[in-house]
């Protein structure tokens, strides 16, 4: 394996491990019941989460974003999770935003360095539109599936250009392998799909 591919695989493994830890942490927070707040697009909670993160560490940068509650067809979810990394402290902190407030703010006790997402990424609604146009709609209609998760990160699922920031949308259906759709977060184009 070449040095570049080995480095990519190592970084991808670290990012995926952090994403799993982040998801498990947020899964422990109860989901909204009756009176669920209105959903909002991923970018709508970014300013609040970024302000909180930069009060925690002035060099904090967004490295990962994921829906914490169901996301609808327009790209809105009642709660989104934002993970920040501070290079100076070599620590991560997660913020879960719902209804214009921070619901969770906790350090992630895992050591890893992850690249920040690039500026100018498309919002969750545009990512869904691209994924649905390419493969998501067909999967939903043919397999009775639904969009269960979407996450924004850099360098985990694009082996050709690993420094790109991408949205990864995961569609699930009963008794079927999941469908993964990777959307370039700058161009809004599908870069890759696979079942697994």
Report each predicted region and the residues it spans.
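Bacterial N-terminal signal peptides that target proteins for export
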Residues: 2-18
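Long, terminal "pre-/pro-" and other extracytoplasmic accessory regions
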Residues: 2-5, 23-196
């Amino acid at each position: 394996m070449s040095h570049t591919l080995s480095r990519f695989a190592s970084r991808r493994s670290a990012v995926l491990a952090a994403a799993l830890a982040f998801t498990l942490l947020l899964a422990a927070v109860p989901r909204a019941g009756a009176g669920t707040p209105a959903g909002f697009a991923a970018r709508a909670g970014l300013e609040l989460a970024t302000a909180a993160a930069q009060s925690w560490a002035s060099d904090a940068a967004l490295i990962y974003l994921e829906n914490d509650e169901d996301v609808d067809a327009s790209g809105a979810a009642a709660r989104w999770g934002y993970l920040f990394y501070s290079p100076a402290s070599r620590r991560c902190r997660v913020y879960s935003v719902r209804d214009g407030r921070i619901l969770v703010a906790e350090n992630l006790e895992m050591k890893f360095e992850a690249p920040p997402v690039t500026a100018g990424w498309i919002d969750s609604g545009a990512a869904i539109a691209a994924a649905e146009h390419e493969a998501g709609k067909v999967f939903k209609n043919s397999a009775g599936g639904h969009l269960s998760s979407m996450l924004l990160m850099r360098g985990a699922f694009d082996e050709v250009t690993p420094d790109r920031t991408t949205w990864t949308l995961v569609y699930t259906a009963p008794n079927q392998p999941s469908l993964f759709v990777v959307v370039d977060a700058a161009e809004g184009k599908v870069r890759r799909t696979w079942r697994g």
